[in-house]
Every structure is written in structure tokens, then in C-alpha cells.
A protein has these predicted regions:
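Short, surface-exposed amphipathic charged segments that create phosphate/polyanion-binding patches used
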Residues: 40-45, 61-65, 105, 109
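Active-site/ligand-binding-proximal alpha/beta "capping" segment
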Residues: 48-99
């Protein structure tokens, strides 16, 4: 799901960069998070933010076994503080020698955590 404001996934450069994967992925665009949440239904939300809880301390016992959404913000600005009230905010801790994580890398780490921790 892509929630506005967001990058234009239909931009020709984006489609070219996907090397054809664009045509094999279902993409849904939403005008707001509220619109997305209404359609997504009952689920857990995990916004990834600098003010979130340490990802490593969050275990399956602390959440029901149901669908969940991993929420990421813009690479330069992240998510608005309003997302602190949405679900369970999490943070990917890293060494002080690392300035920041690229959005793609952060999403990859989070998905690995999700599939490994929750045994999907």
C-alpha cells in the first residue's frame, strides 16, 4: 500500500528501475492513513520511527497472531509524530557510526524480523 504523500510509483523512472517487478506487484494507493486502515481491517500496526521501542525487544508473545502492517515514512523525514499513537512504534537500532538506514534496507530488516520472529 502507498499512502499519500508518497513517491509516484507510476513514474517511468520508477517502473524502469523495478526491472519489470512493477507488473507483478499489486499496488494500492490511498489518500490517507485513515482510508488505508478502514480498508485493511483489524490488524496490528508497527510504524518504524526513531522514537519507537527497540525492535529486538518485541516478541510474538507481545502481540496477537493476526495480520499486521509495517509502516515506513519518507527517507528524509520519516513518519510524523502522530504515528506514535498508531499501533506499536518500533525502531531499528544501529551503531553510532552509522548515520541512518536507507528506506529499502530498513524495510528489508523489518520484513526479515517479521518473518523470522513470527514464523510466517
Amino acid at each position: 500500500a502507498i499512502i499519500e504523500p508518497a513517491a509516484d510509483c507510476f513514474d517511468p523512472k520508477t517502473i524502469r528501475a523495478s526491472m519489470g517487478a512493477f507488473f507483478r506487484v499489486r499496488i494500492h494507493n490511498y489518500k490517507s492513513f485513515e482510508e488505508y486502515a478502514e480498508e485493511a481491517g483489524e490488524r496490528d500496526y508497527f510504524p518504524f520511527m526513531l522514537k519507537g521501542r527497540d525492535l529486538e525487544q518485541f516478541t510474538p508473545e507481545k502481540t496477537p497472531n493476526r495480520p499486521c502492517s509495517l509502516i515506513f515514512g519518507n527517507e528524509s523525514r520519516g513518519l510524523d509524530d502522530g504515528y506514535l499513537e498508531v499501533g506499536t512504534p518500533l525502531c531499528i537500532r544501529h551503531l553510532n557510526t552509522v548515520d541512518s538506514l536507507n528506506l529499502t534496507i530498513a524495510a528489508g530488516i523489518a520484513m526479515h524480523w517479521q518473518f523470522h520472529t513470527f514464523n510466517y
